[in-house]
Amino acid sequence: MSLPASFDLTPEDAKLLLAANVHLGAKNVQVHNKPYVYKTRPDGMNIINIGKTWEKIVLAARIIAAVPNASDVAVCSSRTFGQRAVLKFAAHTGATAIAGRFTPGNFTNYITRSFKEPRLVIVTDPRTDAQAIKESSYVNIPVIALTDMDSPSEYVDVAIPCNNKGKHSIGLIWWLIAREVLRLRGIIPDRTTEWSVMPDLYFYRDPEEVEQNAAEEAKTEEVEEAPVAEAETEWTGETEDVDWADSGATPAAEDAAASNW
């Protein structure tokens, strides 16, 4: 059975997936994830078939694009590495982001202020986002999940096999899904046109590391500005205007003229 051309993984996307370690799976394999294993390394780590990862990304994007109202898609991430990614995904596609702890009753208890009725739920990790998946099963909401080889597949309708523990892997998968959704909606005209948003925007950034880098940049700027400021004050020093008439001193030219040669 031949698949459409959109399901073919391009060399550029394959390089991105390998560079972000999307292919590095867990050592344990859940029975439903066995078809996604390419091979097992001598150290026991399972290598994920990135061709099947890409096929599931395209399938998930088609499901997302089929939802008429973009805000009816809820994207969840209790895992820290995925919170920035889901927020960026929501900003670019119009979905509803639930970053951080999932409040129990979000999908089932209509009395709560945070009550939502999405038509589709996407989670970063079936283990950390188990509450969201469980509530989705109660109200018949389909679930798309980023699954590692050891992730449970109960109540998951579409599993995207990938490394869902690395910050670069999680960010890249969300970026690829967002790009594919925008292609299907026609915002990105065709597959030859590159998306202006870089994958780095979806990667998790440690707040302490960001503050440290900002402080170091500020220090280097101060060190560079200090010599320039000293040089400016040295050359722009104002000279005092002296009134020679008040001081009683006569100019040298008058002294020479008055003297008898």
From Swiss-Prot:
One Gene Ontology CC term in the entry: cytosolic small ribosomal subunit
Gene Ontology molecular function, alphabetical: structural constituent of ribosome
Cystine pairs: none
Domain of life: Eukaryota
Composition bias, Acidic residues: 222-244
Main localisation: cytoplasm
Record region (Disordered): 210-261
Known partners and oligomeric status: Component of the small ribosomal subunit. Mature ribosomes consist of a small (40S) and a large (60S) subunit. The 40S subunit contains about 33 different proteins and 1 molecule of RNA (18S). The 60S subunit contains about 49 different proteins and 3 molecules of RNA (25S, 5.8S and 5S). Interacts with RPS21.
Entry function: Required for the assembly and/or stability of the 40S ribosomal subunit. Required for the processing of the 20S rRNA-precursor to mature 18S rRNA in a late step of the maturation of 40S ribosomal subunits.
HAMAP family assigned to the protein according to its UniProt record, in alphabetical order: Ribosomal_S2_euk
PANTHER family linked: 40S RIBOSOMAL PROTEIN SA
Protein's name in the database: Small ribosomal subunit protein uS2
Gene: RPS0
